[in-house]
UniProtKB/Swiss-Prot annotation:
UniProt keywords, alphabetically: Disulfide bond, Secreted, Signal, Vasoactive, Vasodilator
Consequence when changing E28L: Reduces serotonin and tryptamine binding. Reduces serotonin binding and increases tryptamine binding
Residues the record lists as binding histamine: Y115, D132, E135
Protein source organism: Anopheles gambiae (African malaria mosquito)
Pfam families found in the cross-reference section: PBP_GOBP (PF01395)
Effect of Y115L: Modestly reduces serotonin binding and significantly reduces tryptamine binding
Protein name: Short form salivary protein D7R4
GO MF annotation terms: odorant binding
Family label: Belongs to the PBP/GOBP family.
Effect annotated for changing D160L: Reduces serotonin binding and eliminates tryptamine binding
Top-rank lineage group of the source organism: Eukaryota
Binding residues for serotonin: E28, H56, Y115, D132, E135
InterPro entries: PBP/GOBP, PBP_GOBP_sf
Annotated tryptamine binding sites: Y115, D132, E135
Length: 165
């Protein structure tokens, strides 16, 4: 019985590792030439338009598990992290609004529309913190259980500096 439980657990962990897929770094490594020179702008959350940017943001938002495969924003993946960093009832409204906006555009543009909508909303500052924290966790720069603190600003600056940004 114990052997079956252990085997089942091991197989589940292996399956999750396979499903997890790409990281933000993987997405940045696949940037097309036209965007490679703009990586630092992208990392500063500057809005860049175009189909190549749509594809990149889709990749990054999927890597962080903030959107579904079809690019729709995942309310449940962002609501708690946003409110842990900053408790604000507007996060709920902004997530709903941005999900509503992204479902009205073609699938290829959804993740980018969701991303831009969140950045432009009153949730934007907190969304950037959640985004940075999740990226740092994914890159192994901070423990998975770690909450956002002021020191993450410097950790992220150091991480960006290592990328020549």
């Amino acid at each position: 019985m114990i052997r079956q439980v252990i085997t089942s657990y091991f197989l589940t962990v292996c399956l999750l590792a396979l499903v997890q897929g790409e990281t933000v770094q993987d997405c940045e490594n696949k940037l097309p030439t036209s965007l490679k020179s703009r990586l630092c702008e992208i990392r500063r959350y500057e809005i860049i338009e175009g189909p190549e940017m749509d594809k990149h943001i889709h990749c990054v938002m999927r890597a962080l598990d903030f959107v579904y495969e079809d690019g729709r924003g995942d309310y449940h993946k962002l609501y708690d992290p946003l409110n842990i960093i900053e408790l604000d009832k507007r996060h709920d409204v902004n997530l709903e609004k941005c999900i509503g906006e992204c479902v009205q555009v073609p699938t290829s543009e959804r993740a980018h529309v969701f991303y831009k909508c969140l950045l432009k909303s009153t949730t934007g500052r907190t969304f950037k913190k959640v985004f940075d924290l999740m990226e740092l966790k994914q890159a192994g720069k901070v423990p998975q259980h770690q909450r956002y603190t002021a020191e993450f600003v410097q950790i992220m600056k150091d991480y960006d500096k290592a990328l020549n940004c």
